[in-house]
């Protein structure tokens, strides 16, 4: 009988490029590919250690002199909606949720383009065409859903979230919505609705991506109770956002080789840095 040993994930580091969150900073990412057998287990394990997924790549910040970007997740059991968040839920009661397999549609792309053009025209995704959008949605080696929110009155697609289903929660990979409805707080609404989905499914967490102190576009995440950030190799409740700073320092981040050595992988594999 022949046994095939699991292939150890290879970890790489991107070249530095301008940080999209903090002006004047440079970002760098540590990443690996999701391929072969065991991708679900690898995705689950690394998501619990601050990694995020983009198509078939898992990555997390590994900046040389800055550690401001921290993965964030909401503990469903510890979440209590504020009065404002309850109003947001009520304001969007006319939206119907539908979770589908990861398949891109023309309606999704039209909404996606409208969202980018009006909210993130200078962002790194601003030039994505329909084929690149389809790849973002459909090229997933793990269990992924497209969660669509449709207006019951007009039948218009109003918001979309590309969501991964993990063993311990839901990961909101990317979300977008009608930019002409700021009063509806659709971004906040989708997070609130995912908390409810996770609660109904018995999943303890909703992963939100990164929280960055000092970044205005990321500040809304700190408004959710039960928020935890991945800091110093462990998940820490964010009780006082002001206690975290975005200051940079050459000793803020451990050497890449040390970061890779400390990554915990599914049983039977060990990380390798290339």
From Swiss-Prot:
Task: Name any one GO molecular function.
Answer: leucyl-tRNA--protein transferase activity
**Chief location category:** cytoplasm
Q: Which InterPro entries match?
A: Acyl_CoA_acyltransferase, Asp_Glu_LeuTrfase, N-end_Aminoacyl_Trfase, N-end_Aminoacyl_Trfase_C, N-end_Aminoacyl_Trfase_N
The gene from which this protein is expressed is: bpt
Provide the catalytic activity annotation: N-terminal L-glutamyl-[protein] + L-leucyl-tRNA(Leu) = N-terminal L-leucyl-L-glutamyl-[protein] + tRNA(Leu) + H(+); N-terminal L-aspartyl-[protein] + L-leucyl-tRNA(Leu) = N-terminal L-leucyl-L-aspartyl-[protein] + tRNA(Leu) + H(+)
Q: What species does this protein belong to? A: Ruegeria sp. (strain TM1040) (Silicibacter sp.)
One GO BP on record is:
ubiquitin-dependent protein catabolic process via the N-end rule pathway
Q: Which UniProt keywords apply?
A: Acyltransferase, Cytoplasm, Transferase
Identify one Gene Ontology CC term for this UniProt entry. cytoplasm
Q: Which family does it belong to?
A: Belongs to the R-transferase family. Bpt subfamily.
Cell compartment(s), UniProt: Cytoplasm
Which cystines does this chain contain? Answer: none
Which EC number(s) does the record attach to this protein?
2.3.2.29
**Mind telling me which Pfam families this protein's record contains?**
ATE_C, ATE_N
Q: Superkingdom of this entry's organism?
A: Bacteria
Report the protein name in the record: Aspartate/glutamate leucyltransferase
**Annotated function:** Functions in the N-end rule pathway of protein degradation where it conjugates Leu from its aminoacyl-tRNA to the N-termini of proteins containing an N-terminal aspartate or glutamate.
